[in-house]
From Swiss-Prot:
InterPro entries: NUDE (IPR033494), NUDE_dom (IPR006964). This is Nuclear distribution protein nudE homolog 1. Signal peptide: none annotated. Residues 14-195 form a coiled coil. The gene is NDE1. It is found in: Cytoplasm, Cytoskeleton. One of its GO terms (molecular function) is microtubule binding. Self-associates. Interacts with PAC1. Keywords: Coiled coil, Cytoplasm, Cytoskeleton, Microtubule, Transport. One of its GO terms (biological process) is chromosome segregation. It comes from Cryptococcus neoformans var. neoformans serotype D (strain B-3501A).
Length: 666
């Protein structure tokens, strides 16, 4: 600050005087303030001194009081020390006593723990034994329950077997009666129709085939279709052609739907005009009836020209009108039988038996593909008429002609004894009639050179397709149709050559409900699963429904059925030499059949139904080749075994095991 004052320069003495005067005033004010502070400090110090003196006096007094208190506490301390010593002595004695008692309790506790450990070990052993006993008991209970379940399943299987045997016997009896009535009706129809011999001339082959088909449609309507009857046939019959009696078909489910004709049905059947296809309705038709009913291609009644075709007689018109009125009665009985057959299939369906589907009924009965039949030997001397254009076109695919075919297979015709194939339900009947011949999409003609017949005589049981999901199908009555694919492929089954005892071997195998054995002397009906698609899945009319063959070789077989095989050791026995001679005579009239048209109802039904699954979808299909015209099946060769190039399909499991698996899943 002094340096600052030295550095200050004044411009004039007055400024310097004013400056120092100001500083003097400041120093004087500071001195006055300092004096006031000093006086105040002195006064506060005096007051503080007085307070300290008072406090010192109070502290002296308090110190005296504390000394007296210390003396009193010392006395009390001595007193409590004596008391403490006495209590300590008492505590020591008590502690020693408690220690002795605690030692005693510890020893007792150790003994108790040892005893408890022994008890626990014994308890563990007992519990272990109890668990072992409980486990053994549960095991025995499970075995007992399993044995009861197996016993129950076996009892159910036995009950189902008894029911199936009863139903099978009943259906066979009904079938036998129906066949007898059909035979009577066929005889009456053969006698009822008498064709006038007028207007005899050389007939046109195209018209002959059309006339034959129209008659076949009429007969199919009479027997199977609930639709309106066809127009009375104006044409004549040609070389009769039908289907041979299938040896295993008598045990299949198809025949179970043939109703037992009531008296009204008999009366109506006596008035129905005869057509060549009616000769296929009976197995007991004699050769005289066949010759009288069908005639021969060379007879004057069959050699009319198109211009000389006689019109339907008034008596025949009356018969058709009567048939139109009374036809529903027979179908009522038919549907009753079909309902009972469905009930039987539903019972079998509850057991979840694996069913092998029939994908195309054309491969089961040869519908619309080829027709084979055995006829009476009276038609062995007949000659086939000239083939028309359609038959020739169909026969060109197989490198032969209808004339050559008729020469190779004489004696086959529609008038041969066969079976009636009935559809299931009214909605599945195929409308037939002469009007259906104008429709396109015709199946193959039955005049193919690969056409073969393995049926023997009309008094044998009829074969069915292998794998038909019929609860009444037995292992000894499998279809011989599947054997035709092996003939087309030119192969011979190595496991069945010369096997005469196929029936006996097949029934010795364990069978599922689809293979329940039945007596071989009676017929076996087929399930509706077979003949149900017969009306809907094939583009054929009534003629194709009757064209059922035991071993029809179909080159265009459905893909879903070409892999099917007949179980080894099953099927009808091989043909004898006499049977072959009968086949050779029965194929003369084969070339007289014409193409079968497709009706509109068939196309609708076929569109509604999808293709059926094949049980051999992953298997290579055997190549189907047309058999040579002159080839014949050897006498020792079976006709019911299919040839496979891969592993054959597995045999269905027994129903008891399947039912057991279904219960386990539930």
């Amino acid at each position: 600050m002094v340096d600052d004052e030295d550095d200050i320069t004044f411009d004039s003495p007055e400024e310097e005087i004013a400056h120092y005067r100001e500083k003097y005033r400041q120093a004087l004010d500071m001195l006055t303030d300092t004096r006031a502070e000093l006086e105040e400090f002195q006064q506060s110090s005096k007051e503080l001194e007085d307070e300290m003196e008072q406090e010192l006096a109070a502290n002296d007094k308090q110190q005296a009081d504390l000394r007296e208190k210390i003396k009193r506490l010392d006395a009390e301390k001595e007193e409590w020390r004596t008391k403490h010593i006495a209590l300590q002595k008492m505590h020591s004695s008590t502690t020693s006593a408690m220690q002795r008692e605690m030692d005693n309790l510890r020893s007792e506790r150790d003994k108790t723990l040892v005893a408890l450990r022994d008890l626990e070990m014994g308890n563990d052993e007992l519990e272990r034994n109890e668990r072992v006993a409980i486990s053994s008991l549960l095991d025995l209970e499970s075995k007992y329950n399993r044995a009861i379940e197996e016993k129950t399943l076996l009892e159910q299987d036995l009950a189902q077997k008894d029911e199936l045997e009863t139903e099978t016997q009943r259906l066979k009896d009904e079938l036998r009666e129906a066949n007898e009535e059909i035979s009577i009706l066929k005889d009456q129809l053969a006698r009822a129709i008498a064709t006038p011999p007028s207007s005899v001339s050389t007939s046109s082959p195209i018209h002959d085939a059309a006339c034959d088909l129209s008659r076949i449609h009429l007969s199919d309507d009479i027997n199977a279709s609930p639709l309106p009857p066809p127009v009375p046939s104006k044409n004549k019959s040609i070389t009769p052609e039908g289907h041979s009696p299938r040896r295993g078909l008598s045990r299949s489910g198809t025949m179970s739907s043939i109703p037992v004709a009531s008296p009204s049905t008999k009366r109506f059947s006596q008035q129905i005009p005869h057509s060549p296809s009616f000769s296929t309705l009976s197995r007991s038709t004699t050769s005289r009836n066949l010759a009288a009913a069908a005639g021969t291609p060379g007879s004057p009644a069959l050699a009319r020209s198109r211009s000389g075709i006689p019109q339907a007689s008034p008596a025949r018109g009356i018969v058709l009108a009567s048939h139109q009125q009374t036809k529903s009665r027979g179908f009522k009985l038919l549907h009753d039988l079909q309902a009972r057959l469905k009930a039987t299939d539903d019972k079998l369906g509850g057991a979840k038996v694996p069913r092998r589907n029939v994908s195309n009924p054309a491969s089961v009965f040869g519908v619309g593909k080829r027709v084979t039949s055995t006829t009476s030997t009276t038609s062995s001397t007949t000659t086939a008429p000239a083939p028309h254009a359609r038959v020739t076109a169909l026969a060109k695919d197989h490198n032969t002609t209808p004339t050559a075919q008729s020469q190779q297979f004489p004696g086959s015709g529609i008038m041969s004894p066969g079976w009636v194939l009935v559809g299931e339900g009214e909605g599945e009947d195929t409308p037939t009639g002469p009007w259906s011949m104008t429709l396109p999409a015709e199946p193959n003609s039955p005049l193919d050179p690969t056409f073969r017949s393995s049926s023997t005589t009309s008094n044998r049981s009829l074969p069915s397709r292998p794998g038909i999901p019929s609860p009444l199908a037995s292992g000894s009555a499998r279809s011989t149709t599947s054997g035709t694919a092996q003939r087309q492929a030119g192969q011979r089954p190595s496991s069945r050559l010369g096997l005469k005892a196929s029936r006996r071997d097949s029934e010795a195998r364990p069978l599922s409900p689809s293979m329940i054995p039945v007596p071989s002397f009676s017929s076996r009906p087929m399930s509706p699963d077979v003949y149900q698609p017969l009306r809907s899945a094939t583009p054929t009319s009534g003629f194709s429904s009757f064209s059922a063959s035991a071993s029809t070789s179909n080159p265009p077989r459905p893909n879903s059925r070409t892999g099917k095989r007949n179980p080894i050791g099953r099927g009808p026995p091989p043909l004898s030499s006499s049977t072959r001679l009968h086949h050779q005579r029965s194929r003369q009239s084969l070339s007289g059949a014409g193409p079968t048209p497709t009706t509109g109802a068939d196309k609708v039904e076929r569109a509604k139904r999808g293709p059926r699954r094949s049980s051999l979808s992953n298997m290579d299909k055997p190549s189907l080749m047309s058999a040579s015209p002159g080839s014949r099946t050897p006498s020792g060769r079976p006709t019911s075994v299919h040839v496979f190039r891969e592993t054959p399909p597995p045999v269905p499991r027994i129903p008891s095991a399947i039912l057991k698996e279904s219960k386990v899943k539930k």
